[in-house]
Amino acid sequence: IVIPRTMEDLDLQKVAGTWHSMAMAASDISLLDSETAPLRVYIQELRPTPQDNLEIVLRKWEDNRCVEKKVFAEKTELAAXFSINYVEENQIFLLDTDYDNYLFFCMENANAPQQSLMCQCLARTLEVNNEVIGKFNRALKTLPVHMQLLNPTQVEEQCLV
C-alpha cells in the first residue's frame, strides 16, 4: 500500500502528551469491529524520546478487562514514519496534525498477502469536533485502499484502566 506522505516537516516534540481516539478506520473492518479486535486500540499518550523515536501508550481490551500497553516506534529516514512491531503491523505514520487539536495516524502491515491499514483520528480533548472528523474522512479518501469507518466516540466504549 503506497501512502501519501504529508508530514515531512513534523516537529515530533509537539505531538507529546495526552490524546484520545475519536474515530478509527481500517481497510479490513474485522481488525476493528469488536472490542477485542486486534487493532481496536485507544491511544492515551505519545512520548517522543530524545533520539526522535516515539513511545505510544495505548489501552486495549484483553481477557474482559482493559489493559495498558506501550508500543515503541523507531524512527526512520522519513520524519513522520516509524517502524513498529505490534500485532502484524510493521509501520506507523502520521498523516496530519495541527499539534493542538488533532492528529491523524495510520498503522500498516506492508507484508503480503495480509496487507492492511488502520487509521485513527486523535484529539486532545474528548469533545467531538465535526470539522476534524470531516477532515479525517477526507484524508482517508486520499489513501489507496477503501477504508471503513468506525466511530468509538461514546466514552463508555472507550477502554479505561
From Swiss-Prot:
This protein's UniProt keywords: Disulfide bond, Milk protein, Retinol-binding, Secreted, Transport
Record flagged with keyword Lipoprotein: no
CDD domains: lipocalin_beta-LG-like
Keyword Repressor recorded: no
GO terms for MF: retinol binding
Annotated compartments: Secreted
Tissue specificity note: Synthesized in mammary gland and secreted in milk.
Domain of life: Eukaryota
GO CC terms in record: extracellular region
Summary of subunit composition and partner proteins: Monomer.
Entry function: Primary component of whey, it binds retinol and is probably involved in the transport of that molecule.
Name of the protein in its database record: Beta-lactoglobulin-2
Protein's organism: Canis lupus familiaris (Dog)
Gene: LGB2
